[in-house]
Amino acid sequence: MNQEVKSGKVLSPSTPWTQRPVPGIEVADEQQTLKATFTEPTIECPECHALVTRTAISFNAYVCPQCDEHLRMKARDRLNWFFDNVVAELGQEFSAKDPLKFVDSKPYPDRMREAQTKTGETEALIAMQGNLNGVDMIACAFEFDFMAGSMGTVVGDRFVKAAELAIEKRQPLICFAASGGARMQEGMLSLMQMARTSAAIQKLKDTGLPYIVVLTHPVYGGVTASLAMLGDIHIAEPKAMIGFAGKRVIEQTVRETLEEPFQRAEYLLDHGVVDQIVHRHALRDTVSRLVSKLMNLP
């Protein structure tokens, strides 16, 4: 059989032309290249489209090492990254009910099960007690992938419990907000959480304890209209979208075209809505420093 040898490989006449070497050009072995590239899962940056391994992006706090884009961080990952040491998780005893027997394209309990399977979490808010740089504090984080981080009764229960524990322990409360708003499947019960969380925050403030909100991408609706805008200090991550109604809804209502950076963190900083924009890598130290100043700690 007529065969030719190229680069140590035996090629037969049936070898596709795409696999035949071009004279004068060195080509890496295809299998070695694939093995090197796909030894672990990768994440594509939505901004620069660079492929980054999950290990690398996790080590970098979910900030793209190529373009510095802040990728969305899961709530549990964020709290574990934020705290030096986690003491306890709060509010795990609360579970969602379906008092309205709500059905849209599918029953509410089915949506809940899908969200739990997708995220591995039982609800859209995780609350933990831990310490950062030697200071004990309470922190909450929204899981946006759980029904768009929508606020229902369990989210309200967990937030209120976190605020009450902060008061009891004389510790500051930190909230990482990321939500599409109130959960429509719970109707008025969901809207009531705006009042409940706001009242809990006021009790916290009455005791002189700080409440710091970190606005991550995105924050909208009833969460913006309540707990996300009641902080003593509001920090935003770069390029986070923050608002009540979305840009498209507003444009359709007022029949005007809004300027491009509308509702971006940078635009809101220029207009006095947020106090500062902080890179995620500097966030732990920034919160720690603010807490120390607000609580007159050494």
UniProtKB/Swiss-Prot annotation:
It comes from Acinetobacter baumannii (strain SDF). Residues 41-298 form the CoA carboxyltransferase N-terminal domain. A zinc finger (C4-type) spans 20-67. It catalyses: N(6)-carboxybiotinyl-L-lysyl-[protein] + acetyl-CoA = N(6)-biotinyl-L-lysyl-[protein] + malonyl-CoA. InterPro entries: AcCoA_carboxyl_beta (IPR034733), Acetyl_CoA_COase_Trfase_b_su (IPR000438), ClpP/crotonase-like_dom_sf (IPR029045), COA_CT_N (IPR011762). Residues 1-21 are annotated as: Disordered. Component of the acetyl coenzyme A carboxylase (ACC) complex. Biotin carboxylase (BC) catalyzes the carboxylation of biotin on its carrier protein (BCCP) and then the CO(2) group is transferred by the transcarboxylase to acetyl-CoA to form malonyl-CoA. GO terms for cellular component: acetate CoA-transferase complex. Its main location: cytoplasm. Its cofactor is Zn(2+). This is Acetyl-coenzyme A carboxylase carboxyl transferase subunit beta. Acetyl-CoA carboxylase is a heterohexamer composed of biotin carboxyl carrier protein (AccB), biotin carboxylase (AccC) and two subunits each of ACCase subunit alpha (AccA) and ACCase subunit beta (AccD). It comes from the Bacteria. Its EC number is 2.1.3.15. NCBIfam families: accD. Binds 1 zinc ion per subunit. Pathway: Lipid metabolism; malonyl-CoA biosynthesis; malonyl-CoA from acetyl-CoA: step 1/1. GO terms for biological process: fatty acid biosynthetic process; malonyl-CoA biosynthetic process. One of its GO terms (molecular function) is acetyl-CoA carboxylase activity. Belongs to the AccD/PCCB family. It is found in: Cytoplasm. The keyword GTP-binding does not apply. Keywords: ATP-binding, Cytoplasm, Fatty acid biosynthesis, Fatty acid metabolism, Lipid biosynthesis, Lipid metabolism, Metal-binding, Nucleotide-binding, Transferase, Zinc, Zinc-finger. Zn(2+) binds at residues 45, 48, 64, 67. It is an enzyme of class 2 (transferase). Pfam families: Carboxyl_trans.
